[in-house]
């Protein structure tokens, strides 16, 4: 058998994640050769437009998925939060790796935490989810769109009049930047994106050999938690550029799921907390409770201008 080709985006963080998967596989299968195949995705190439305006189906995944379907690569490593809830026909997730810290973090230019920033301070983020929740927490803040990899965002913070930037804790920790974190943002203030902090490995469905190999990387508690979150997102027909947050944790047999839908200005935030044993069912039930509070109306208001 030849080498196993692992597809990945070519950013430093994506390469870290793919290298982590590669090292794990080398530990389990020392007799096999594993090689990384870096690729650029559409989302990596278009950096001057906010994500919400590009549309988000497979923005950071499509090129890798084409590689899976045409046999160019054997598996693809993704940040789970970038993977749409509906995968292209013929593809599946073979492993949900153990989740890193799912919260968001604030990196302040001068060490001032979010709650103490002066009115009018500018926060760098392109995420509608982060903006909406921050506006709900502090309506006196301003925002600047911020795209690019983590190194680019950090550089832009230093070179601009932004007071700070909001990033996913997992990526910051994986790059060894813990000393740059001013604070971890409480989930009471900011619920994270669906699947945030988890690495997923995608394969072509007919590749039973690769599925079996990746089974050792799958983390059961992470799988159950993120499946509940993804079921909520699917039921709400949300994409990763819509202000929907979810965070599930497993406690013995139970899964506790928190869900959130926000209006763009953060004036309306709907929340739900629900527990159950079955991930997909729990996600659907939590979404239905949000729908009963008016979630679909909020989401339609957001989608209409984005679709024009």
UniProtKB/Swiss-Prot annotation:
Disulfide bond recorded as keyword: no
Pfam family, one: Porphobil_deamC
Pathway: Porphyrin-containing compound metabolism; protoporphyrin-IX biosynthesis; coproporphyrinogen-III from 5-aminolevulinate: step 2/4
Modified residues (S-(dipyrrolylmethanemethyl)cysteine): 240
Signal peptide start-end: none
GO biological process, one term: protoporphyrinogen IX biosynthetic process
Cofactor (UniProt): dipyrromethane
GO annotations of cellular component type: cytoplasm
Cofactor note: Binds 1 dipyrromethane group covalently.
Record keywords, A-Z: Porphyrin biosynthesis, Transferase
Record carries keyword Phosphoprotein: no
This enzyme's EC code(s): 2.5.1.61
GO MF, one example: hydroxymethylbilane synthase activity
Its job: Tetrapolymerization of the monopyrrole PBG into the hydroxymethylbilane pre-uroporphyrinogen in several discrete steps.
Subunit structure: Monomer.
Note: The porphobilinogen subunits are added to the dipyrromethane group.
Listed name of the protein: Porphobilinogen deaminase
Lineage of the organism: Bacteria, Bacillati, Bacillota, Clostridia, Eubacteriales
Name of encoding gene: hemC
